[in-house]
Amino acid sequence: MKHIPFESSKYYHIYNRGNNKENIFIETQNYIYFLKLMTKHLLPIASIYSYCLLSNHFHIVLRIKDENHLPEKMQIGKTKIHQPFSNMFNAYTKAINKKYKRQGSLFQ
């Protein structure tokens, strides 16, 4: 994912696709796990307005919470707001790589 400077109280369209246009969701359980990771990593910092998960890519429309509603460690000058996104994508990639005995980047 391209690093852009996320700002509190702003809306974003987050999207990514599989490396080499490969599928990132192989079976139903993959979609469910991705949604669980979204809940765990993104809901503490953002309101999710919509999402679309397709076999080889996804879209998420969200709004980063106001500064005073962000967890303390995410507030300006502490940890970067992009860190939960990185954690989510890394966790998903590791799970897919382990389950399907693959290695390397999952996302483009």
Task: Place the predicted regions along the sequence by residue.
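Short catalytic/metal-binding and nucleic-acid-binding patches
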Residues: 1-108
